[in-house]
UniProtKB/Swiss-Prot annotation:
Source species, domain of life: Bacteria
Chief place where the protein resides: cytoplasm
Swiss-Prot/TrEMBL GO biological process terms: DNA replication; DNA synthesis involved in DNA repair; double-strand break repair; SOS response
Family annotation (InterPro entries): AAA+_ATPase, DNA-binding_RecF, DNA-binding_RecF_CS, P-loop_NTPase, RecF/RecN/SMC_N, RecF_2
Name of this chain's protein: DNA replication and repair protein RecF
UniProt record similarity statement: Belongs to the RecF family.
Length: 374
């Protein structure tokens, strides 16, 4: 069983609808119930900001500060982390530039947010993801990249560096500046970063596929088959240096086409994650809404197990409205599967009775009007 990473305290100041709130946690799962709009998801968002990035809502930091506050917000968490007990503080101060947030680990300023992954891994599932299989391909790429990030924290830096290089290329092409040596340098950088991104995604899909293959057939959630499409399809068994050369050549040959289009038409930013319901041999987008939700739950749980297996530390799960559309039997099975992962989960819902099968495996909190009771 992986080591259990768990929060013991969470304190928020001027965060969303919370002027100040403090939760004492005992390592069990945490169930947050209350009316819609009470602030349950806000608490989940705060926990999600203990990982690199902008959290489960991807909100601008300036939008997170409580309306009516002087400005800024803070999050403090104490936890039994991957390297032992640790205290993490993050937020922005009044009047600060809001594109970045401050981060302190045990009171010391962190150099980058990637340092958070030394202490915990966070995975989440929210109602906003329910349309993942039918929505835009960019949503599926973002979902896959978060899966990769949980095991390869450098993936985020590669992706942002690729985007930056691509914007530089697009700007040169838009301005009609076809300097071959300048463009070639940018395209070589894009090729190195882009192929590394694509290979990391492919590796994640392979790891998940092997784990799903080993799953018992009696699982209450359907299994998914996964593949990438739209960039260098079927080519990734070749040496990476050959792939980089091919992609760089592709970019060089498509300069005038991309200039006319106003964007780069080939690259990992154009790939799509294709998901099938294995048992039905059906594309996920053609499955019923309930089947899509069950597929997504099964996929997130498989990934959580993979993270625990490969790191030796169970990830913390944030499961927003997870029980809303599951019958009683499937809810109970879900809670058992979450238990089997060996970690701590935060779950939300409007009705506490939907979580009764957890019994004493969880702490129960009631959320109302910017306050938490329990």
């Amino acid at each position: 069983m992986p080591h259990k990473v768990s929060l013991s305290r969470l304190k928020l100041t001027d965060f969303r609808n919370y002027a100040a709130v403090s939760l004492a946690l005992d390592g069990r799962h945490a169930v947050l119930t209350g009316n819609n709009g009470a602030g349950k998801t806000n608490l989940m968002e705060a926990v999600s900001l203990l990982s690199p990035g902008r959290g489960l809502r991807r909100a601008a930091y300036g939008d997170i500060t409580r309306v009516g506050a002087a400005g800024g917000f803070s999050i403090f968490a104490a936890l039994d982390g991957m390297e032992g007990e640790v205290e993490i503080g993050t937020g922005i101060e009044a009047g600060e530039e809001t594109t970045t947030r401050k981060l302190r680990i045990n009171g010391t300023p962190a150099k980058t947010a990637d340092e958070l992954t030394d202490h915990l891994r966070l995975l989440w599932l929210t109602p906003a993801m329910d349309g993942l299989f039918t929505g835009a391909s960019s949503d599926r790429r973002r979902f896959l990249d978060r899966l990769v990030l949980s095991l390869d924290p450098a993936h985020g830096r590669r992706a942002s560096d690729f985007e930056r290089a691509m914007r530089s290329r697009n700007k040169l092409l838009d301005e009609g500046r076809f300097d071959p040596s300048w463009l070639a340098g940018i395209e070589e950088q894009m090729a190195s970063l882009g192929i590394a991104m694509a290979l990391a995604r492919q590796e994640m899909l392979g790891l998940l596929a092997r784990l799903i293959e080993e799953r018992p057939e009696s699982s209450p959630f359907p299994s998914a088959s996964l593949q990438l499409s739209g960039f260098m399809d079927g080519q990734f068994s070749r040496p990476s240096v050959d792939l980089e050369d091919e992609y760089a050549a592709m970019l060089a040959e498509s300069r005038y086409r991309d200039a006319s289009a106003g964007r780069t038409l080939d690259g990992p930013h154009r790939a799509d994650l294709i998901v099938h319901h294995r048992e039905k041999a059906m594309e996920a987008e053609r499955c019923s809404t309930g089947e899509q939700k069950a597929l997504l739950v099964g996929l997130v749980l498989a990934h959580a197990r993979l993270v625990g297996n490969l790191t030796g530390h169970a990830p913390i799960l944030l499961l927003d409205e997870i029980a809303a559309h599951l019958d009683e039997g499937r809810r109970a099975a879900l809670f058992d599967l979450i238990d089997g992962l060996g970690g701590q989960a935060f779950m939300t819902g409007t009705d506490q009775t939907m979580f009764s099968a957890l019994a004493d495996r969880a702490q129960f909190f009631t959320v109302a009007d910017g306050k938490v009771f329990g």
